[in-house]
Swiss-Prot record:
PANTHER family assigned: DULLARD PROTEIN PHOSPHATASE
Underlying gene: Ctdsp2
Species assigned in the record: Mus musculus
Modification Phosphoserine occurs at: 5
Any one annotated GO CC term: nucleus
UniProt xrefs under Pfam families: NIF
Official protein name in the record: Carboxy-terminal domain RNA polymerase II polypeptide A small phosphatase 2
Site feature (Transition state stabilizer) residues: 162, 200
């Protein structure tokens, strides 16, 4: 098994291309993050919406209404199906988290950056066994990750969901999440492999999608549920990055909503 198959990462050159195309937000140490993050989110699926809008002009008003109704019904059926015991990825909601929004948080290039090459200022060095040989993984923590996770744990039911393998991601999360913010951890086997990408299907969690949000640096990860997503720029080693710090007030605003679709839609509005 190759090193690259253990950790699922964004490439630095891909992140630069996406940033230039407006597919992800770019943080600035001088400006607080506000509603602009959600404008970036809309850009992620601009092409998809253009295709849909061009074809929708051929629909009658009645057909459009039926399409919306079918979409709502499908979402409802998916949610009800995963309420059947043993079919959902997450355990029952604890008493502590009753009524809270479930926030699904990615690991690599969202909270940390890891490398098999030595990093002088690594926050963690994690041994990972690959085909009988132990390799060292050097892990950098994104700036303000501790403050971000602490606040998220106070407000939400937090779930780690990574496309990396558990043999790497589990020990990294042990070191990163000292306070036990994550109620559950999901790894690659919980993803859906779709068109060459590991997709995090939120409908399989067993949570109401109206009260579920995903934070991820890869739009492909949430392609099934773009309207539940808060995008974040891929992080590699910029120690001046303030993305997580600037996201705290955004999530504080979301924490009191009963419908993330409505709240995220309002925040995306110009």
């Amino acid at each position: 098994m190759e090193h690259g198959s253990i950790i699922t990462q964004a490439r630095r050159e891909d992140a630069l291309v996406l940033t230039k195309q407006g597919l992800v937000s770019k943080s600035s140490p001088k400006k607080p993050r506000g509603r602009s993050i959600f404008k970036a989110l809309l850009c992620c699926f601009h092409t998809q919406h253009v295709v849909q809008s061009s074809s929708s002009t051929e629909l009658t008003h009645k057909e459009e209404a039926n399409t919306i109704a079918k979409s709502d019904l499908l979402q409802c059926l998916q949610y009800q199906f995963y309420q059947i015991p043993g079919t959902c990825l997450l355990p029952e909601v604890t008493e502590q988290d009753q009524g809270r929004i479930c926030v699904v948080i990615d690991l690599d290039e969202t909270l940390v950056h890891s490398s098999f090459k030595p990093i002088n200022n690594a926050d963690f060095i994690v041994p990972v066994e690959i085909e009988g040989t132990t390799h060292q993984v050097y892990v950098l923590k994104r700036p303000y990750v501790d403050e971000f996770l602490r606040r998220m744990g106070e407000l939400f039911e937090c779930v780690l969901f990574t496309a990396s393998l558990a043999k790497y991601a589990d020990p990294v999360t042990d070191l990163l999440d000292r306070c036990g913010v994550f109620r559950a951890r999901l790894f690659r086997e919980a993803c859906v492999f779709h068109q060459g990408c590991y997709v995090k299907d939120l409908s399989r969690l067993g949570r109401d999608l109206r009260k579920t949000v995903i934070l991820d640096n890869s739009p492909a990860s949430y392609i099934f549920h773009p309207e539940n997503a808060v995008p974040v720029q891929s992080w590699f080693d910029d120690m001046a990055d303030t993305e997580l710090l600037n996201l705290i007030p955004v999530f504080e605003e979301l924490s009191g909503t009963d419908d993330v679709y409505t709240s995220l839609g309002q925040l995306r509005a110009p």
